[in-house]
Amino acid sequence: MEDNLFHIVDKKTFLQALLEATFVAILPIWGYILQHIPTINEYLIGVVPRDWNHIYGILLFPIVHHDLSHLLGNVLALYILLILLKNSFSPYFYRIVLCGWIFPGIFIWLVGNSNTMHIGASGLVYHLAFFIFWIGIMIRQRTFIAQSLIVIFLYGGFFWGIFPLFPEVSWEGHLGGFISGTIQALILSKPISKLYPKEEN
């Protein structure tokens, strides 16, 4: 099989990857805009652990951010990872994004500190980063190895985010993304390897 770095075969495919990555990455931006509309803001909440009255926050917390700096930091990382994901794992793109969107919130709801609210897209970012990283380790293929190295280079410090080192940071969301990204990489490594066979020296 002929291979290039991102499995991009033509300009149209690349533009589609940019478009779909933009579609997902822009959701937190819309969420941030809606946060500044008083009649809507009260319904935009994060995850409140074990609070059944606000369990819908599991679905909303990736689009809710504390301030512009928090938003831009997450959106930039998210956009880069989404482009890598779409280029190399297109058949599984939305399945991976959906898992990364929901599972960290469920994890926070189950194990997070009560009487706290967790917000931000970092759980999804961690899911994508560790999914891409582990696939590169599991499948001996130049594209995936290269993308693992990109993740290490850009987000190597992410590993420390899964530990409770900073009280203002939702480490539970990071840990949830790490766990879900790792599990999904294990589950999808076999079908992905069939799409892109291991290369021989």
Task: Give the label of every model feature segment.
Residues 2-201:
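A detector for small-residue-rich transmembrane helices and their helix-helix packing motifs
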